A protein has these predicted regions:
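Active-site-facing substrate-recognition patch
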Residues: 1-60
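PRPP-dependent phosphoribosyltransferase catalytic core
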Residues: 2-11, 134-197
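Phosphate/pyrophosphate-binding loops at sites that engage ATP/ADP/AMP, CoA/4′-phosphopantetheine
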Residues: 53-64, 133, 137-138
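Short glycine-rich phosphate-binding loop at a beta-alpha junction
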Residues: 62-73, 147-149
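Short, glycine/charge-rich flexible loops or terminal/linker lids adjacent to PRPP-binding catalytic cores
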Residues: 78-117, 125-131
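Residues immediately within or flanking Cys/His clusters that coordinate Zn2+
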Residues: 198, 214
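Short cysteine-rich clusters marking metal-coordination/redox-active sites
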Residues: 201-204, 217
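Cys/His-rich microdomains that often coordinate metals
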Residues: 208-209, 221-222
């Protein structure tokens, strides 16, 4: 793992990973949440995001003319990669066509037939990435790859994106497990973050708060 990639992972673990009860865009719930925008919109985080995405793109020899994704999770990633590269343009995909002005859904770079990479911040169901891929192809772009910053590895997100992107590949820079593991390393050993997602107390079944020396809830942790 490159130095920039490790630093980006550490920043995600510190600034973007949260424990608690959260409702996901998929409609489900989770005991953790990853808000990548607190990292991708951070000054240092933006630099690292651009560098690490660009490293991955160059390693795969996609040679895109532009990079884009569905607003708004993709927005800071698009800008970061474009600025870092100095040669790759950016475009944003609206969730719906404008009802005034030009009425277009693709904003920014608009060269039909161009090689493009679709990006997103977090992939859960993959719906936003799929929307962007479909809109890009409908416009006339040649999608050569799809990427996300963090993949949650649930809700059939990867299969959905892979089907939509095919024959182009789908690449995630990190998994939620990677970020959670790094979060553990950066926190005290008795932090709730030590636990696997959904861990419960061995005595009463409530959400556990420690696994040292045993998995227990707040009431039974002593």
């Amino acid at each position: 793992m490159s130095t920039a990639r490790q630093e980006l992972l550490s920043l995600l673990a510190r600034q973007s990973f949260k424990l608690g009860e959260f409702k996901l865009s998929s409609g489900g719930t989770s005991d953790y949440y990853i808000d990548c925008r607190t990292t991708t919109l951070d000054a240092r985080g933006a630099q690292l995001t651009g560098k690490v995405f660009l490293e991955e793109i160059q390693a795969r020899a996609w040679k895109p003319q532009a990079i884009g994704g569905l607003t708004m999770g993709a927005d800071p990633i698009v800008v970061a990669v474009s600025v870092t590269s100095g040669t790759i343009s950016g475009f944003l995909v609206r969730k719906a066509e404008k009802q005034h002005g030009t009425g277009q859904r693709i904003e920014g770079f608009r060269e039909k037939g161009a090689r493009v990479v679709i990006v997103d911040d977090v992939c859960t169901t993959g719906a936003s990435t799929v929307q962007a891929i479909e809109a890009a192809r409908e416009f006339g772009f040649n999608v050569v790859g799809a990427m996300c910053l963090v993949e949650r590895e649930e809700a059939q997100g990867r299969p959905s994106v892979e089907r939509a992107a095919a024959p182009a590949p789908f690449v995630s820079l990190f998994t939620a497990g990677d970020v959670r593991k790094q979060h553990v390393l950066q926190n005290d050993e008795t932090s709730p973050s030590l636990l696997a997602v959904g861990a419960t107390c061995e005595i009463c079944g409530l959400l556990a708060v420690t696994n040292h020396p045993r998995v227990r809830c707040e009431l039974h942790k002593a």
